[in-house]
Swiss-Prot record:
GO MF assignments: methyltransferase activity
Domain of life: Eukaryota
Catalytic activity, EC: 2.1.1.-
Gene designation: METTL25
Name listed for the protein in its UniProt record: Probable methyltransferase-like protein 25
Residue ranges, annotated region (Disordered): 326-352
Function of the molecule: Probable methyltransferase.
Biological process annotations from GO: methylation
UniProtKB keywords: Methyltransferase, Transferase
One Pfam family per UniProt: Methyltransf_32
Length: 603
């Protein structure tokens, strides 16, 4: 195990359960907003049923709340938010006791902020965890380096942050094997293998993904080798440049010294040594180059340093053993000593174990890893945006396998989670459910509902950053539903319209295309009738906009419930030494930004 500091203190199980109780109290009234489907917004008179305020009032209050939060300095926000707790139990101020309609948007927004992961005080700072895992080892590399060119900006951001944490945990335990569940295209797996020298098994249920990951990894290895070669050329080129500069400096100094000796004492003139004017390829020069590179990366990139970025970023993206030290003999004559040949041979052998192996398998909570991975050893289990039930099943596999010493799971697609207490009237054969996992929520027989889980996927931070909701497309779909109900007598339709909106030039075009896709006779409706529906509901579009903003504001609370459920489950396990929620990503770049992390007790 690497030298390290004590791991950060995290909330214990009783504290987390107390947080859950307060959250449930709020959600019992608020969940009806999240569970309302925008498709049925006009047909079911959703606004009149759930909100007792004008839409203009709701929008103005939510905008004011968002601007006030944004105006607070980041360092003072936790102090202000800590003062909210005293008023959080006075729910009649938010919802009417008799009608259960929303009556105070301000109180609603305040409660929703309080019950988010970031403000509940249940999140462990990423940097604090890294420092504890690493002890006195190297500090975190900044994200201003370019990652592998095969990833977009979002994926690069996610992979760099998560792989850094995983490698730190691996070093902490002295582990070399990693299992990446739901590995998809293999970005995380490849990066862990190539940059950090870990042996990674990427498991995905899609054979297409597995083959794609293999091909991508092959190209990535080729790219990595080119980076390796280029990085050595960069180092050698800089060494030659520095040597030439020193040669010029020595010539100038030489000339000055010679003139001084000649003028002061002509009889003592001596021939200058040849070493004074030859390039200096001693170890000190190479050391100086390395020091420059380290200094460059230990400081923020200033404008004057930009010219060095491309030269040096390659080396820091390579594994530790990928770049060979450049000796003084290698630069001038390009010859490799026997010792260097032997070292390269050893490096090649060691790198054979640092591989990425994509595998195809459908993983459940009962999957037997020994049947999938023949050389299973002490390892870490990770998952980057594991979909639906795979995220909770990752935690179950972790707790039931002694070889898995740590887990780092970032889930997504909450709408695909199976819920134990949803549709209880239906016959069920499933034994292990995606939600709930912990004892407390099982005892409460808590159910979110699919629409609420779907709304948990909404990205509040992106909306706040100006990436607004697609109100018009939602409006088109809600009006279409009323047309289908009135003109075709259909109240529930199992078929989906899909992403037709982006292909349509107008509302009329949207309705025609949608009816055709749904298998309905669109010739039955003249243009005038269709446009009458549009004109009828257009003045009420702001109701839909305001309602969707309420859902967006509430979304973090439902995500908090799901994440707290998983963390409480881990806290209930006896052999787990440490567990936490950690915000890994920038939520604007990657909305599903929270990792559930747990480490087992050392044997």
């Amino acid at each position: 195990m690497a030298a390290s500091c004590p791991l950060p203190v995290t909330p214990d199980l009783p504290t987390l359960r107390a947080k859950l109780q307060g959250l449930l109290q709020f959600l019992r009234d608020a969940l009806s907003i999240s569970n309302a489907h925008t498709v049925d917004f006009y047909t079911e008179s959703v606004w009149e049923e759930l909100v007792d305020l004008p839409p203009e009032t709701v929008l103005a209050a939510l905008r004011k709340s968002a601007s006030e939060t944004e105006a607070l300095p980041s360092e003072t926000r936790p102090l202000v938010e800590a003062e909210w707790e005293a008023g959080m139990t006075d729910f009649p101020k938010i919802f009417c006791e008799t009608s259960q309609k929303l009556v105070s948007v301000e109180a609603f927004a305040l409660a929703a902020k309080y019950y988010s992961v970031q403000n509940l005080g249940i999140c462990t700072p990423f940097e604090q965890l890294l420092v504890a895992l690493r002890g006195n080892q190297n500090q975190r590399i900044g994200e201003n380096q370019k990652a592998v060119e095969f990833m977009n900006m979002k994926k690069s951001h996610e992979v760099q942050a998560m792989s850094e944490l995983i490698s730190s945990i691996a070093d902490y335990y002295g582990i070399k094997q990693v299992i990446d569940l739901g590995s998809g295209k293999g970005y995380l797996s490849s990066f862990l293998s190539l940059k950090y020298g870990l042996k990674v098994y990427g498991i995905d249920s899609s054979n297409t993904n597995t083959h794609g990951a293999e091909e991508r990894n092959r190209k990535l290895k080729k790219h990595w080798k080119l980076c390796h070669a280029q990085s050595r050329l960069d180092v050698n080129g800089l060494a030659l440049k520095m040597a030439k500069e020193r040669k010029v400096q020595n010539k100038v100094k030489n000339k000055a010294d010679t003139e001084e000796v000649f003028n002061n004492s002509p009889t003592n003139q001596e021939k200058m040594p040849t070493s004074a004017i030859l390039p200096d390829f001693s170890g000190s020069v190479i050391s100086n180059i390395r020091n420059q590179m380290e200094t460059l990366h230990s400081q923020p990139h200033q404008e004057e340093n930009l010219c060095f970025e491309n030269s040096f970023s390659l080396i820091n993206l390579l594994p530790i053993n990928a770049v060979e030290p450049t000796s003084s003999q290698q630069i001038p004559n390009r010859e490799t000593s026997e010792a260097n040949k032997e070292r390269r041979k050893m490096t090649s052998k060691s790198s054979e174990s640092n591989i990425y192996s994509p595998l195809t398998s459908f993983i459940t909570a009962d999957s037997e890893l020994h049947d999938i991975i023949k050389d299973l050893e002490d390892c870490l289990m990770v998952g980057l945006h594991t979909c639906g039930d795979l995220a909770p099943n990752t935690l179950r596999i972790f707790t039931s396998n002694s070889e898995i010493k740590g887990v780092c799971s970032v889930g997504c697609c909450y709408h695909l989670l199976s819920e134990e207490f949803e549709n209880q009237h239906k016959e069920r054969t499933q034994e292990k459910w995606g939600f709930p996992m912990c004892h407390y929520l099982k005892e409460e027989r808590w159910c979110c509902g699919r629409n609420a889980r779907m709304s948990a996927c909404l990205a509040l931070e992106r909306v706040a950053a100006g990436q607004g909701l697609p109100t018009e497309s939602l409006f088109y779909r809600a009006v279409l539903q009323d047309i289908i109900k009135d003109c075709y007598g259909i109240t529930k339709c199992d078929r989906h319209v899909g992403k037709i909106y982006s292909k349509c030039s107008s509302f009329l075009d949207y309705v025609r295309r949608s009816l055709k896709k749904l298998g309905l006779d669109e010739s039955k409706l003249p243009e005038k009738i269709i446009m009458n529906y549009y004109e009828k509901y257009k003045p009420r579009m702001n109701e839909l906009e305001a309602f969707n903003m309420l859902k967006v504001v509430l979304a973090p609370c439902i995500e908090t419930l799901i994440l707290l459920d998983r963390l409480c489950y881990l806290k209930e396990q006896e052999d787990i030494a440490w567990s936490a929620l950690v915000k890994l990503f920038d939520p604007v770049k990657s909305p599903r930004c929270y990792a559930v992390i747990a480490l087992k007790k050392q044997q």
